[in-house]
Design a protein with these regions (language model features):
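Conserved ABC ATPase "signature" region
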Residues: 98, 109-127, 179
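Conserved signature/switch motifs of ABC ATPase nucleotide-binding domains
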Residues: 130-133, 151
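Conserved ABC transporter NBD signature motif
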Residues: 62-74, 114
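Short coil-to-helix segment of the ABC ATPase nucleotide-binding domain corresponding to the Q-loop/switch region
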Residues: 91-98
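Catalytic Walker B motif of ABC-type/P-loop ATPase nucleotide-binding domains
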Residues: 156-159
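Helix-to-loop junction immediately C-terminal to a conserved catalytic motif
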Residues: 54
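The feature captures the beta-strand-to-loop junction immediately N-terminal to the Walker
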Residues: 39-41
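Hydrophobic anchor residue at the start of the ABC signature
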Residues: 145
Length: 258
């Protein structure tokens, strides 16, 4: 059974004067432990689809199931990592890591132990008492990911989490995030405008059309060099350019002209 099952989902926004259809007939199944990337033209509804999976939005029609159950509000099985880290500047790193646990009323001592274990495992144990303004952009995003992991969700939704970083930091952080998610055995859905990023991190890449959006193509990412390649090694792999060119052609016909 799929851990995420999106069945014929459509979403419309209504105003007194008109109806705007954002998503139309979206279907998607994701297995536990998969890393999925979603690409599409600007404004096509990629982030909206994440909101639907998280339970923060309800579809106009269709169904979204998490672990076989239809979503009804925000699911504790789902964690979110946004474009901005949203760390509280007046709280140190450890206190920031406990925000999600506090909201969900988890045992504070148990949450703090898990937070320290994660900081230690991923090389940030020396920064537990630092304030966010003492961290680099990449370190802040690592802290944001660890904050999401403290509540131990099964699914991680990543909404362009590297977009605010310079190119070198993006590559480094993408490598780290990929390793952490695979190490933790999580299911991940990444929304990105970057085709290279999508291919290098994902087991599958889904391509969305312009509005009203649907999924128009899906690519199972496999390389002759074998399984278990890091994102950086995937960029150097023999079939990488073939995937890139195919996805680019899919997107080229759905570009939004302003």
């Amino acid at each position: 059974m799929s851990i995420i099952d999106v069945r014929d989902v459509s979403l419309s926004y209504f105003t007194p004067k008109q109806e705007t259809e954002a998503l139309s007939g979206v279907n998607m199944e994701i297995e536990a432990g998969e890393f999925i990337s979603i690409v599409g033209p600007s404004g096509c509804g990629k982030s909206t689809l994440l909101f639907l999976i998280s339970g923060m939005l309800k579809p106009t029609s269709g169904r979204v199931l998490i672990d076989g159950r239809e979503t009804d509000g925000v699911s504790t099985k789902v964690g979110y990592m946004l474009q901005r880290d949203h760390l509280f500047e007046w709280r140190d790193v450890l206190s920031n890591l406990l925000v999600g646990a506090e909201i969900r009323r988890m045992d504070r001592g148990q949450a703090a132990r898990r937070a320290r274990e994660l900081l230690d495992r991923y090389g940030l144990s020396g920064f537990a008492g630092h304030n966010p303004d003492q961290l680099s952009g990449g370190m802040r995003q690592r802290v944001a990911l660890i904050r999401t992991l403290v509540t131990d969700p099964d699914i991680l939704l990543l909404d362009e989490p590297f977009s605010a970083l310079d190119y070198q930091s993006r590559l480094t952080l993408a490598e780290d995030v990929y390793k952490i998610i695979k190490d933790q055995g999580k299911t991940a859905v990444l929304v990105t405008h970057d085709i290279s990023e999508a291919i290098s991190m994902a087991d599958r890449v889904l391509v969305m059309s312009k509005r009203p959006s649907s999924i128009i193509a899906a690519y199972k990412i496999r390389f002759e060099e074998g399984e278990g390649l890091s994102p950086w090694k995937k960029r150097e792999a023999s079939q990488y350019n073939d995937y890139f060119n195919s996805i680019w052609k899919d997107l080229d016909g759905h570009a939004v002209v302003s």
